[in-house]
Amino acid sequence: MDLVATPKNPIPLGVSIGFLKGKGGVPLRYARWRSALKERHGTVCIFPGRSEFIEKYFEVVGELRRRGFAVAVLDWRGQGGSGRLMRNSLKGHVKSFNDYEDDVARFMNEVALPDCPPPYYALAHSMGAPCCSRPRPCAAAGSRAWC
């Protein structure tokens, strides 16, 4: 699934979009951008709130890149461009809150750590905060996160 732009909310240049397999094979959409500056300050990993999506953060992504940060954003399972667990795609559902924890660990191990420069910072809104601050995501990032 491509990112969606509007005239007032364009996609920041240089995006790399992909999917990783979450727990149970659920496709999880992510996007990442390199820093717009040669002087790099690390990577900001954005973890949206409930019912949010990558596109909501385009303005934030642009500002962070202009300040020398790479950015990686994850769409939660059941939200944004990620896979759904219900037939009705308008309903968000997760079998266990621990699935979010597993998704963050996979996102860090497969997307952020291999392809984005350290140190790693978490920028989380609402539901994103408890999901990225639980023990497994922090352990997946190791001593390289969260600053």
Predicted regions and their residues:
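Conserved alpha/beta-hydrolase
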Residues: 61-87
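Alpha/beta-hydrolase active-site loop
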Residues: 92-112
